[in-house]
């Protein structure tokens, strides 16, 4: 019964229905770490920030895993608790995360800096080696998109358009709306990152 609810929650496209399935599983097995994890992630996708934090804190205690940090930090940001979000972003446990999760945290931090009105800091925090090393990773599209968004918020529209183009090329499945953003800014969507030059990110 619990497993079926968890699978249903994972497969459900509608955030509210996913949350409802996960919540039933949580009522049946509240002391199981994976149940609290799935419930927390479902709550996050449904915009239930406080509950997401509560469930993911429990999952963290029960499993000993730190992989929830990016989602927890983003939930704190959504609640307007920027200092708490930054505490998570800079916690010692970040060193235990995969590089993909660390990049997720940097993307959250960039958003926090924008919320603080520090648009240039939002750009700088994303200037990591993976931004310009020419390699495409599963999370490159998200990184390029966040960088483009930060550039746009900083008033650097031409650079932002270039990076939205890169994001669209690195995101063939269309998981972001990078292609739409390119069109909004009057750019052209290219199909391959090889079509771009080797220019480094702006300072």
Model region roles, listed by residue range:
Residues 1-20, 24-27, 31-34, 38-44:
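Alpha-helical segment of the N-proximal tetratricopeptide repeat
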Residues 1-2, 32, 65, 102, ...:
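Residues that mark the junctions of alpha-helical repeat units in TPR/alpha-solenoid scaffolds
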Residues 5-8, 39, 72, 109, ...:
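Structural register within alpha-helical repeat arrays
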Residues 12-13, 46, 79, 116, ...:
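Structural motif corresponding to the intra-repeat A-B loop/turn of tetratricopeptide repeats
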Residues 23-31, 57-64, 91-99, 128-136, ...:
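Solenoid-like repeat scaffolds
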Residues 35, 68-69, 143, 177-178:
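TPR alpha-solenoid repeat register
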Residues 83-155:
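Extended, charged alpha-helical interaction scaffolds
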